[in-house]
Amino acid sequence: MDLSNIDSWVFDLDNTLYSPEEEIFSQIDKKMTEFIISKFNVDEEEAFNIQKKYFLEYGTTLSGLMKRKNIDPDEFLEFVHDINLESLKPNNKLTSIIEKLPGDKFVFTNGSKKHAENVIQQLQMNKVFE
């Protein structure tokens, strides 16, 4: 397959550049519940229900919090992405394959820029992406 005419590649970050088995999202999911508990002084069950309701109604918990509760997205993203990334290990084979692709490589995420940078650093892919 000739890929030489492709000048840009966009890769999703979470559960794409690393396996869903790494359980990173479960940490983020828990942090979303914690954020709602702290912001609205509700118990864990109510916070979980709010989180899932907004996810279903608005596509993301954050979108619902912004529209219904006027939550600052940067504050939310900073809080929920303050997680432990130590389980992420470099995948040298994947890194090598991506490096060999012609053109520029970019990472796309609905997370924060800091989260993307932290994940890329933990995966030792800093030099691969723009």
What is the predicted role of each segment?
Residues 2-11, 16-93, 103, 114:
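N-terminal helical cap/lid subdomain that shapes the substrate entry/recognition surface
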Residues 96-106, 110-130:
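Substrate-recognition/cap helix-loop segment adjacent to the acidic, metal-dependent catalytic center
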